[in-house]
Amino acid sequence: MAKKVVALIKLALPAGKANPAPPVGPALGQHGVNIMAFCKEYNAKTSDQAGMVIPVEISVFEDRSFTFVLKTPPASVLIRKAAGIEKGSAQPNNQKVGSISRDQLKEIAQTKMPDLNANDIDAAMNIVEGTARNMGVTIND
């Protein structure tokens, strides 16, 4: 018989740096999950992506066991890294803070493809381009 899911927890944690301190501890602790076991497993799976923020979806079962699914890093993080900027623009319409090429945009779209609601790479590129535009990042052809 399948185990019953009692909670679905979504967190965005730095790759390879999960620890029992907030936000991990309180989120998992209230469901009775072994926090250290999660931290060790998460850090092992994300150690190759150091410096990125990796969203994770944790399913907690009634016997207090858990499984988790790693998502792709947020588009804004990938765009910031590609453009070499610290943060997006406060006024994206007036103040441009950086630029990325079409090739970089396509690369980001391919990375994000599994998590996007897009049928092909062009649709994914449009989604990522919209995010870039809202951050004050221009796309060069």
Swiss-Prot record:
Keywords: Methylation, Ribonucleoprotein, Ribosomal protein, RNA-binding, rRNA-binding. GO terms for biological process: translation. Pfam families: Ribosomal_L11, Ribosomal_L11_N. GO terms for molecular function: large ribosomal subunit rRNA binding; structural constituent of ribosome. One of its GO terms (cellular component) is cytosolic large ribosomal subunit. The keyword Transcription regulation does not apply. SMART domains: RL11. One or more lysine residues are methylated. Belongs to the universal ribosomal protein uL11 family. Part of the ribosomal stalk of the 50S ribosomal subunit. Interacts with L10 and the large rRNA to form the base of the stalk. L10 forms an elongated spine to which L12 dimers bind in a sequential fashion forming a multimeric L10(L12)X complex. Forms part of the ribosomal stalk which helps the ribosome interact with GTP-bound translation factors. This is Large ribosomal subunit protein uL11. It comes from Crocosphaera subtropica (strain ATCC 51142 / BH68) (Cyanothece sp. (strain ATCC 51142)).
